[in-house]
Design a protein with these regions (language model features):
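Conserved Rossmann-like nucleotide-binding pocket used by diverse enzymes
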Residues: 41-44, 70, 96, 131
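A short beta-strand-turn-helix
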Residues: 43-66
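N-terminal targeting signals for export/organelle localization
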Residues: 1-46, 179
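Structural microenvironment flanking redox-active thiols in thiol-disulfide oxidoreductases
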Residues: 78-115, 125-131
Length: 179
């Protein structure tokens, strides 16, 4: 009985080490979102460039849309920005932004200097609007179908590989197979 008393903590420790070791090899970008297949969370925030106007979930209905959560302090956001500008020029999809935990003048200056790929940008200075979306960092990009259902969530900078492998096939499926 005494040996079992010492063996149980050792076994528990080994199990924890096993879980930790397994976790080292998981890709954090593949964390499934509980929002996939569910309606996009309802929000209504000030529009970044014009606080008298609002940007709401309903603005993204009717066609496939991207919602990109970004910030000026985010290194990954700077990395993906040139790709977002290229994507905006193609007109493949309506793109919207949500500026997260930022200062309005800094965000406006960022878009003025680097270009604005978004049709509208929600200003979320305290992060309250992004909480319902399950955002815990930036950049994060959501693909939303015409009915407002979240189809896919991408963590980290968006680039050509993720666009071609993850987004394009889903958009084609929404459009009946046409690319």
């Amino acid at each position: 009985m005494k040996s079992l008393k010492y063996l149980l903590p050792a076994l528990a420790f080994l199990v924890l080490v096993g879980f930790f070791y397994r976790g080292l090899f998981l890709d954090p970008r593949t964390v499934p979102s509980p929002l996939i297949g569910k309606p996009a969370p309802v929000f209504e925030l000030e529009e970044l460039s014009n606080p008298a106007e609002t940007f709401a979930t309903s603005d993204m209905l009717g066609k496939p849309a991207l919602l990109n959560v970004w910030a000026t302090w985010c290194v990954g956001c700077r990395q993906e920005h040139s790709f977002l500008m290229q994507l905006a020029r193609t007109g493949e999809i309506d793109m919207y932004g949500m500026n997260l935990r930022d200062e309005r003048p800094k965000a406006l200056d960022w878009l003025r200097r680097l270009g604005n790929p978004y049709a509208k940008v929600a200003f979320d200075p305290d992060g309250a609007g992004s909480l319902d979306w399950g955002v815990y960092g930036s950049p994060e990009t959501f693909l939303i179908d015409p009915q407002g259902i979240i189809v896919y969530k991408h963590l980290g900078p968006l680039g050509p590989a993720a666009w071609m492998e993850e987004f394009r096939p889903r958009i084609a499926a929404m459009q009946g197979g046409a690319q």
